[in-house]
Amino acid sequence: MATHYSIIGGMIIVVLLMIIGSEGGRLLEKKNRTSAEAEHYNVRRYLAENGLGQTPPMGWNSWNHFGCDINENVVRETADAMVSTGLAALGYQYINLDDCWAELNRDSEGNMVPNAAAFPSGIKALADYVHSKGLKLGVYSDAGNQTCSKRMPGSLGHEEQDAKTFASWGVDYLKYDNCENLGISVKERYPPMGKALLSSGRPIFFSMCEWGWEDPQIWAKSIGNSWRTTGDIEDNWNSMTSIADSNDKWASYAGPGGWNDPDMLEVGNGGMTTEEYRSHFSIWALAKAPLLVGCDIRAMDDTTHELISNAEVIAVNQDKLGVQGKKVKSTNDLEVWAGPLSDNKVAVILWNRSSSRATVTASWSDIGLQQGTTVDARDLWEHSTQSLVSGEISAEIDSHACKMYVLTPRS
């Protein structure tokens, strides 16, 4: 019998309890279910009908680095760089415009209009260019009467019209923000856009950005493909770790077709150390977060490229099982994060969030392995393998750094 993983069983039971309306219920312990059985266990999932997001989306978003200082040349050059740096071949496919791409006023027919100075060729021409590179284009709007910058109109009351416009341009992704919302509940403002996108005639990934205000992870699965669980990330250690913790508590609600979104990556923007960025990327990958690069990839340094192009870490994020890893142990800022992968493997992060070098240990009981299991431990950052590891895995780790492993049980 394949090795039993309590993590897989536990997370599946959480989903089942949610569906039958027993969110506060006691998790029933399931014995003797192999991980293969767990992977195929028939649990109903309420997912958006567009079939997108079977793994977390990967790509780039303009906001963290450029803010409103964005134009079509930057976007074209970013698409070029996505291909030339090898990121596209690793799965980074979305080139996403954030706020400020449109004129403040709609045209005489009520349609959104690209900013004439920044996007003189229009969004359709830009989408055509991005598509010619084998990539996909995303745009931004807001479930209010204006966007957060107040420089372009929101889509509240124009959902069907705007969705048809986006589809006619060849848009593949919509980030939908939450500003200028007139005090109307997100549960009233977001479903109309989800429905409009489904009726637009084009598959468009729907990224809901309501900042976790009304616990979208509970109700958004039938509406969108991802949902922000927190406010905006900032390019510093305290913001990144706080968001990681806030997002973690909703781990059981994520899965293929619908993902928790702790916001875009800050790797390469300069506000954290290399090891802090390594931790940032590792935790986002394990948490099955959308991997949307937020730096200027046209000018990124070698270290940034090395961090965001680690194929082994990306593979954890894109694993087909689609179970979000989570924090399973924390003692004095020494943490263990773990989650199950396909083929009975387990991903583990040993994270030192303390202010000094320390040893971090994950015992098999922490991460859901049976005590007698022997594994091969693949270090995803060192690209090395320890064979025949049993009982626990341990490492001495610098302050704010981490180690990330994939454990493969010996048969």
Curated annotation (Swiss-Prot):
Catalytic activity: Hydrolysis of terminal, non-reducing alpha-D-galactose residues in alpha-D-galactosides, including galactose oligosaccharides, galactomannans and galactolipids
EC class: hydrolase
Pfam families linked: Melibiase_2, Melibiase_C
Listed EC numbers: 3.2.1.22
Active-site residues, as the UniProt record annotates them: D177, D232
Residues binding substrate: E210, W211, G212, W213, E214
Example GO molecular function: alpha-galactosidase activity
Signal peptide, first to last residue: 1-24
Domain of life where this protein originates: Eukaryota
GO CC annotation terms, alphabetical: plant-type cell wall
SUPFAM superfamilies with a match to the protein in the record: (Trans)glycosidases (SSF51445), Glycosyl hydrolase domain (SSF51011)
GO BP of this protein: carbohydrate metabolic process
Disulfide bonding pattern of the chain: C68-C100, C148-C179
Residues glycosylated per entry: N32, N145, N352
Pro-piece positions: 25-47
InterPro entries for this protein: Aldolase_TIM (IPR013785), Glyco_hydro_27 (IPR002241), Glyco_hydro_27/36_CS (IPR000111), Glyco_hydro_b (IPR013780), Glycoside_hydrolase_SF (IPR017853), Melibiase_C (IPR041233)
Keywords: Disulfide bond, Glycoprotein, Glycosidase, Hydrolase, Signal
Function comment: Involved in the hydrolysis of the galactomannan, it splits alpha-linked galactose moieties. It is particularly suitable for the hydrolysis of guar gum to a gum with improved gelling properties. Preferentially cleaves alpha-1,6 glycoside linkages.
Protein family per UniProt: Belongs to the glycosyl hydrolase 27 family.
Protein's recorded name: Alpha-galactosidase
